[in-house]
Amino acid sequence: MPGGMMADLEAFRKAQRADGPATILAIGTATPPNAVDQSTYPDYYFKITNSEHMTELKEKFRRMCDKSGIKKRYMYLTEEILNENPSVCAYMAPSLDARQDMVVVEVPRLGKEAAAKAIKEWGQPKSKITHVIFCTTSGVDMPGADYQMTKLLGLRPSVKRVMMYQQGCFAGGTVLRVAKDLAENNRGARVLVVCSEITAVTFRGPSDTHLDSMVGQALFGDGARALIVGADPVPEVEKPCFEMLWTAQTILPDSDGAIDGHLREVGLTFHLLKDVPGLISKNIEKSLVEAFQQFGISDWNQLFWIAHPGGPAILDQVEAKLNLDPKKLRATRQVLSEYGNMSSACVHFILDEMRKSSQQNGCSTTGEGLDVGVLFGFGPGLTVETVVLKSVPLQ
């Protein structure tokens, strides 16, 4: 190839890349209207699943709910919907068709609601969105939820779409990692990132032989969160709330089968080992060292924290292992308390909670007054996603 053409190609490639790091420009949220009080949920759950005769199991489930750290959750499944779909209420009854009929409609609809709010906050015309990343663990369909939401929002047909199915609870970090690469390698790109999760795929009646399923029934909630990600924000027009500096993904050693899920005739079943909190807490410091040694940080209390709230035991053990100030996981525990575990969407709810509380409390940055922070996603594998974030000064 002639030297002049090589030089032109190099200049072309360089011109395609952004100058600065990817930033989060807006965040939008959506939940189903049906709010569930955790304190009364055991009575409701055992009644709606025709399991009130299982009194000992009900008391065990009540203890799970009491220890969950959750006050309320939001669920698409109302009493009326469940009464119309008794197969969903049974334990391991063939019910995939009924579940799919719900989620293939509701997942993109809820995602669209969150996306519309993010676009409104961003303040730019939706025609400027160049890429869409849609993530859900709730059902599978073709064309996917990415396509359905694109149509619902009225985005350009040429928008470049990425669909992620069946990633689970670590995927709130995954979508940020992919969005960062897209934004930084495509000058002017504006990436709409949506995580939408509906527990209609996992809801089922109790069983004393499958207690890990009951743990999920005590923890999981529904919600969608959307973000606009882009590099080189337009001054005075776009207002970033966080920058993304570095990302990683790893599979923890000796963790095969620690968390897994399987889509079957009965819906999505999931299994988790008791030692999931131990596996995460034992290995998390290695991920922190890998992420922050390049920034000269080794005191984990210098960071602001956004950790997927898989459950209170994970948070407690991470806190103890790293000697974290209890305030570090305040935003994480707050979201767990108000929404439950919403799988991939959770960490984005925590990002929103942190920036809003930082503003309300008069902090100097969106990261509770700190400059650098970490976002962790934990999920099937056992897989850990790590995102290093930089906060933005608050005026």
Curated annotation (Swiss-Prot):
EC number per UniProt: 2.3.1.74
Catalytic activity annotation: (E)-4-coumaroyl-CoA + 3 malonyl-CoA + 3 H(+) = 2',4,4',6'-tetrahydroxychalcone + 3 CO2 + 4 CoA
GO terms assigned for molecular function: naringenin-chalcone synthase activity
Pathway as given in its UniProt record: Secondary metabolite biosynthesis; flavonoid biosynthesis
Organism superkingdom: Eukaryota
Gene Ontology biological process: flavonoid biosynthetic process; polyketide biosynthetic process
Listed Pfam families: Chal_sti_synt_C, Chal_sti_synt_N
Active site, UniProt feature: C169
InterPro entries registered for this protein in UniProt: Chalcone/stilbene_synt_C (IPR012328), Chalcone/stilbene_synt_N (IPR001099), Chalcone/stilbene_synthase_AS (IPR018088), Polyketide_synthase_type-III (IPR011141), Thiolase-like (IPR016039)
SUPFAM superfamilies per record: Thiolase-like (SSF53901)
Gene3D superfamilies for the chain: 3.40.47.10
Keywords assigned: Acyltransferase, Flavonoid biosynthesis, Transferase
Signal sequence coordinates: none
Function as written in the Swiss-Prot or TrEMBL entry: The primary product of this enzyme is 4,2',4',6'-tetrahydroxychalcone (also termed naringenin-chalcone or chalcone) which can under specific conditions spontaneously isomerize into naringenin.
PANTHER family recorded: CHALCONE SYNTHASE, HYDROXYMETHYLGLUTARYL-COA SYNTHASE
Family: Belongs to the thiolase-like superfamily. Chalcone/stilbene synthases family.
UniProt protein name: Chalcone synthase
The organism of origin for this protein: Pinus strobus (Eastern white pine)
Underlying gene: CHS
